[in-house]
Amino acid sequence: DAAVSVKDDVVEFVNEELPAAKADHDNAIGIYNAYFAGSSDQDLDAFKTSLQDTAIPAMENCITTISNIEVATDEVKALKDSYLQSVQKECEAMKMVVSAIDGENADYLTQADSLIAEAATLRSDYQTKLQAIANEQGIVVNQ
């Protein structure tokens, strides 16, 4: 096998591999955020059900999809790792919220908030790494 260039690897990862995972992710995050945006008239039990039946399985599917993506370069492996860790944190946060609703333990909500913040930091790290690779390789990234 000829060595895969960083440019080809990043383009394949972002344009071809990631979109399938991103669809699950966006769906799950939409469910999660809708409740907190106050635009939802769901009660907590309905929210818990949508997390358990739809959002968490979608996140787990997203995690599996990303985990199974094969990358050829260290640069893109670092990108994949940041993205994967951010999704894992978000999934953990959703599970914490379900536990908080079940046990009505407010500490779980605080922990979920922390996980979401960590996920945002990791996602930002991913964006920064992606932009650096794009600049280096002369690729235009549509975020």
Regions found by a protein language model. Name each.
Residues 2-54, 88, 92-143:
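C-terminal amphipathic alpha-helix
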Residues 56-84, 133-141:
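Short, solvent-exposed, charged loop/turn and helix-capping segments
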